Amino acid sequence: MKIRSQVGMVLNLDKCIGCHTCSVTCKNVWTGREGMEYAWFNNVETKPGIGYPKNWEDQEEWQGGWVRDVNGKIRPRLGNKMGVITKIFANPVVPQIDDYYEPFTFDYEHLHSAPEGKHIPTARPRSLIDGKRMDKVIWGPNWEELLGGEFEKRARDRNFEAMQKEMYGQFENTFMMYLPRLCEHCLNPSCVATCPSGAIYKREEDGIVLIDQDKCRGWRLCISGCPYKKIYFNWKSGKSEKCIFCYPRIESGQPTVCSETCVGRIRYLGVLLYDADRIEEAASTEREVDLYERQCEVFLDPHDPSVIEEALKQGIPQNVIDAAQRSPVYKMAMDWKLALPLHPEYRTLPMVWYVPPLSPIQSYADAGGLPKSEGVLPAIESLRIPVQYLANMLSAGDTGPVLRALKRMMAMRHYMRSQTVEGVTDTRAIDEVGLSVAQVEEMYRYLAIANYEDRFVIPTSHREMAGDAFAERNGCGFTFGDGCHGSDSKFNLFNSSRIDAINITEVRDKAEGE
């Protein structure tokens, strides 16, 4: 058993209001610079829709994630080692700029400098790539916001598989939900396997997946290998970049920027302990519908004395174990079984999980729109948001985990409403879904009124425990595309200018000499 710790995230889609605050703050902090204008490490999509980039869920087109061969082994869908190498100089399955969008601003200066005329001056869009005026803006990262566009285009959503999607194009049957997306920081990342340069790695102390900007050579095969399309090519520096899970903040015990600024307080951060030796077995599961359960088996119980003893032997700090015991991510994913992984069929074992949305379902039930079942709860198999659609997104098509999560949240609401409105304790609903009173009350506290310290349980890092302190001292932090400036490498495949670090000692000596 090889015990490792991972900082995971849960997003409660039941509370997401689609305000895009997480996207804007992430953009301002990490990608508001030349070469990354089109990149959104965090974006919020309206579902159903084809998303950003276009049709990112269609792995037959983009060749992301893993596939299981007949011998029971998994390999990148992009190809084995030789198959990846053959695509170095001509990768046919990398998204083009039109699959994202041409980033633009507006000619605001014209509003001030326009000469006097008969008509009010307008701010025309200008491309942020070549600076030229654009005749028409035709796509964007949130183009499908609030079901924008005709249903014919949104119907290409891959989550409509095994469904009669035509009926959902009718006004009375339409539905929508928000889906915030960021890098999944997977346990079995396919981007790591498809990088020919070995530039992508997963940190042992917190599981964050990063790209070494000095090793990256801009082959862009990682973009194809990532099934979530959350790696972006910086055309200015010639490097690939991705969400870094705000690791400088995580190391000091602070939440990510997107979590800190979330208006709806839908995000939870916490530590999970897992057995790294079980990853290959879990990812190689034969049936895709079993992948969710197999991934859950990878996680370890942080309250188990034998797990604690072994974790301490393997160098897991005590504060990490304590944080894992209080982790809201473990509670939602393992204890209550509310959170589910995004597209587990990609076999990457993602670590950003989602609580399926219930609010539109509950309001529909209150209006008497759902048939009653034999128990207290309505028959939520026939809901406004189709359960099969959520299952295709969160559990590889298996409706069981989705129904369990939705029923438990509805039972929690029934129980709390009976207490606050009727003044009685009605446990029939929670008994029906297999929850105790203590579990439901704790669920309510975390989902409805959780404090800051409840939602974000992040242990500080221990740099003093590094096996090689010299390498840690010389390692660089996040850089904006130029690598660790002071390296010896002068070769640049893309012939872009390199910004070398300023030698402070030489500058000071020169100043003193003058």
UniProtKB/Swiss-Prot annotation:
Entry binding sites for [4Fe-4S] cluster 2: C26, C243, C246, C258
Residues where [4Fe-4S] cluster 1 binds: C16, C19, C22, C262
Enzyme Commission number: 1.7.5.1
Keyword field: 3Fe-4S, 4Fe-4S, Cell membrane, Electron transport, Iron, Iron-sulfur, Membrane, Metal-binding, Nitrate assimilation, Oxidoreductase, Repeat, Transport
SUPFAM superfamilies listed in its UniProt record: 4Fe-4S ferredoxins
Cofactor: [4Fe-4S] cluster; [3Fe-4S] cluster
Localization, UniProt: Cell membrane
Enzyme class: oxidoreductase
Cofactor binding mode and count: Binds 3 [4Fe-4S] clusters per subunit. Binds 1 [3Fe-4S] cluster per subunit.
Sites where the protein binds [3Fe-4S] cluster: C195, C216, C222
Signal peptide (UniProt feature, chain positions): none
Domain 4Fe-4S ferredoxin-type: 7-35, 174-205, 207-236
Catalyzed reaction equations: nitrate + a quinol = a quinone + nitrite + H2O
Example GO molecular function: 4 iron, 4 sulfur cluster binding
Any single GO CC term annotated in Swiss-Prot or TrEMBL for this entry: plasma membrane
GO biological process per UniProt: anaerobic electron transport chain; anaerobic respiration; DNA damage response; nitrate assimilation; nitrate metabolic process
Broad class of the protein's primary localization: membrane
The organism's place on the tree of life at top rank: Bacteria
Membrane topology, record value: Peripheral membrane protein
Binding site for [4Fe-4S] cluster 3: C183, C186, C191, C226
Task of the protein: This is a second nitrate reductase enzyme which can substitute for the NRA enzyme and allows E.coli to use nitrate as an electron acceptor during anaerobic growth. The beta chain is an electron transfer unit containing four cysteine clusters involved in the formation of iron-sulfur centers. Electrons are transferred from the gamma chain to the molybdenum cofactor of the alpha subunit.
Oligomer status and interactors: Dimer of heterotrimers each composed of an alpha, a beta and a gamma chain. Alpha and beta are catalytic chains; gamma chains are involved in binding the enzyme complex to the cytoplasmic membrane.
Name this protein carries in UniProt: Respiratory nitrate reductase 2 beta chain
Species this protein is from: Escherichia coli (strain K12)
Gene that encodes it: narY
